[in-house]
Curated annotation (Swiss-Prot):
InterPro entries noted in UniProt: Deoxyribose1P_isomerase_DrdI (IPR043679), IF-2B-related (IPR000649), IF-M1Pi (IPR005251), IF_2B-like_C (IPR042529), Initiation_fac_2B_a/b/d (IPR011559), M1Pi_N (IPR027363), NagB/RpiA_transferase-like (IPR037171)
The keyword Secreted appears for this protein: no
Name of the protein described by the UniProt record: 5-deoxyribose 1-phosphate isomerase
Pathway: Carbohydrate degradation
Annotated site residue numbers, Transition state stabilizer: C159
Organism whose genome encodes this protein: Petrotoga mobilis (strain DSM 10674 / SJ95)
NCBIfam families, alphabetized: eIF-2B_rel, PRK05720.1, salvage_mtnA
Binding site for substrate: R48, G49, A50, R91, Q198, N249, K250
Family that this chain belongs to: Belongs to the EIF-2B alpha/beta/delta subunits family. DrdI subfamily.
Pfam families (alphabetical): IF-2B (PF01008)
Active site: D239
Length: 347
């Protein structure tokens, strides 16, 4: 990826994002510096993907509080916490959002005995660390993931977990980018990913621009391409992983996992350890975001169902751990039993 989808413009003190709702037809960058704009950008998926949401929240918290005229630390902390809590209401399922906000809060508390200006500088430092760590994380995930793949493989991915979802290679697409650099000549199949078409609009956009062999398929074609022997592995990202390995990801992931198991195809979940939530015992503890039903009935620029027809629009589903071959993180590859192997990542 040559486009960095989320970054900080230090000269202007603004969060800069590429508006992903306009891709692939228009590349428009937005410069944001107030809480309402940043909340809206996260909620409306102008910036999306678990790692990118965390980065946007961190930089957003910094630029939103930078303009504070608070005369003392107590007042500044009150303003900081108001913005933090507001951001936390934007997307309930992606744990990286809360992880980043907690990191920024922890850094604030570590510097609480300093001046307001010193605390602001510390918040800048922490947000830049989160950005830099994400870049290194994606490279490490790519390296570990590539160790499970062979040249010429057919790979299926869902939604978008590439450079547009992070500050680097991404997660699920990281091994594909790394393999491309090494001449692996993968054949990638991307689900269009209804209802918002992140696979069609975003994944094919970035892979095609990178010169990677990518073929777009409708979501309901996945079973056929598996049966035809075109798929050797399924690679997807994750928004939250429970302690037992149950994984929340874009709606449709669970169905792919069931199909992959039936056809004997490995199902790989790729994501940073920051997406692992050991406080969630199982997938039942993960709150699933419900989005506006208009996204379903107006999905192609015009209404596709009669007015008055109801639509159900959960943004994510949970894949049971029994369908997951391995979870690939920046710290390494973990397999069943996930309750033990995931816990070891944090020891």
């Amino acid at each position: 990826m040559t486009v960095v989808p989320v970054k900080l413009n230090e000269l202007k003190n603004k969060l800069v994002i590429i508006d992903q709702t306009l891709l692939p037809n228009e590349e428009k960058f937005l410069e944001l510096d107030n809480p309402e704009e940043i909340w809206e950008a996260i909620k409306k998926l102008r910036v999306r993907g678990a790692p990118a949401i965390g980065i946007a929240a961190a930089f957003g918290l910094y630029v939103s509080t930078l303009k504070s005229k608070a005369a003392n630390v107590a007042q500044f902390k009150k303003e900081f916490e108001e913005v933090r809590d507001y951001f936390a209401t934007s997307r309930p399922t992606a744990v990286n959002l809360f992880w980043a906000l907690k990191r920024m809060t922890r850094r604030f508390e570590q510097e609480e005995d300093k001046t307001v200006d010193k605390i602001k500088q510390a918040l800048l430092d922490e947000s830049e660390k989160i950005f830099a760590e994400d870049q290194e994380m994606s490279k490490a995930i790519g390296k570990h993931g590539l160790s499970l793949l062979k040249p010429g493989m057919g790979l299926l991915t869902h939604c978008n977990a590439g450079g547009l979802a992070s500050s680097g290679y991404g997660t699920a697409l990281a091994p594909i980018y790394l393999g491309h650099e090494k001449g692996y000549n993968f054949k990638v199949y991307a689900d269009e990913t209804r209802p918002l078409l992140q696979g069609a609009r975003l994944t094919t956009y970035e892979l095609y621009k990178a010169g990677i062999d990518v073929t777009l398929i409708c979501d309901d074609m996945a079973s056929l391409v598996m049966k035809e022997g075109k798929i050797d592995a399924v690679l997807v990202g994750c928004d939250r992983v429970a302690a037992n390995g149950d994984t929340a990801n874009k709606i449709g992931t669970s169905g792919l996992a069931v199909l992959a198991k039936e056809y004997g195809i490995p199902m790989y979940i790729l994501g940073p350890t920051s997406t692992i939530d050991l406080d969630a015992s199982t997938g039942e503890d993960i709150k699933i975001e419900l989005r506006d039903e208009e996204e379903v009935v107006n999905g192609f620029g015009r209404r596709t169902a009669l007015k008055g027809v109801k639509a159900y629009n959960p943004a994510f589903d949970v894949t049971d751990a029994k369908y997951i071959t391995a979870i690939i993180t920046e710290k390494g590859i973990v397999m069943q039993p996930y309750k033990e192997s995931l816990k070891k990542l944090f020891e």
